[in-house]
């Protein structure tokens, strides 16, 4: 059985979301609209947390939420790209960036839609990427071995967990 090592407590993760939202608010202070594109369910959980924190900081910014399911069938939910103005800044959001393959796949799709500005946000960043993906907004950077995995658990919203397996 794999051992789990806690990387961040629930309260620390809440602070990470607050900091990331502040960074996004600062980077897009002149914008009134943003488009959050979340990858899979855990990406959507993070997008919702960031949106909540952004509302507390910068209430004049309207955030549209889209969710892309990549693992099984590559399907969109919520606000799809053709419903958003191409001048609206896009922030691609996921829980952990590992090799960068999933993010690369979605970034290519968003680029082909013609968006002017696309940035990325990840709760956790590992340093073992196979693709040239830059993490613009990062909660925590973690040096791992190739055999280790970083996992975000939001099964219990009052006990968020980030741990190393």
Label every model-predicted segment.
Residues 98:
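Short active-site segment of divalent metal-dependent hydrolases/proteases
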Residues 39, 68-70, 123-125:
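Cofactor-binding loop segments of dinucleotide-utilizing enzymes, especially the Rossmann-like FAD-
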Residues 33-35, 62-64, 89, 116-120:
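Residues at the starts of beta-strands that form the adenosine-phosphate
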Residues 29-40:
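Short glycine-rich phosphate-binding loop at a beta-alpha junction
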Residues 92-93:
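Generic enzyme active-site microenvironment
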Residues 108-165:
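PRPP-dependent phosphoribosyltransferase catalytic core
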Residues 17, 48-89, 101-108, 130-134:
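Short, glycine/charge-rich flexible loops or terminal/linker lids adjacent to PRPP-binding catalytic cores
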Residues 1-31:
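Active-site-facing substrate-recognition patch
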């Amino acid at each position: 059985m794999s051992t789990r090592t806690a990387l961040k407590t629930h309260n620390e993760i809440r602070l990470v979301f607050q900091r990331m939202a502040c960074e996004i608010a600062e980077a897009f202070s002149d914008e009134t609209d943003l488009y959050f594109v979340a990858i899979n369910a855990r990406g959507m959980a993070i997008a919702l947390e960031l949106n909540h924190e952004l509302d507390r900081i910068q209430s004049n910014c309207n955030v549209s939420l889209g969710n892309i399911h990549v693992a099984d069938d590559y399907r969109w939910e919520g606000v799809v790209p053709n419903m958003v103005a191409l001048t609206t800044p896009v922030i691609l959001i996921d829980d952990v960036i590992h090799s960068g393959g999933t993010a690369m796949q979605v970034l290519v799709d968003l680029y082909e839609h013609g968006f002017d500005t696309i940035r990325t946000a990840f709760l956790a960043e590992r340093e073992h990427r196979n693709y040239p993906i830059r993490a613009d907004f990062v909660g925590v950077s973690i040096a791992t071995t190739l055999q280790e995995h970083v996992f975000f658990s939001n099964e219990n919203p009052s006990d968020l967990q980030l741990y190393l397996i």
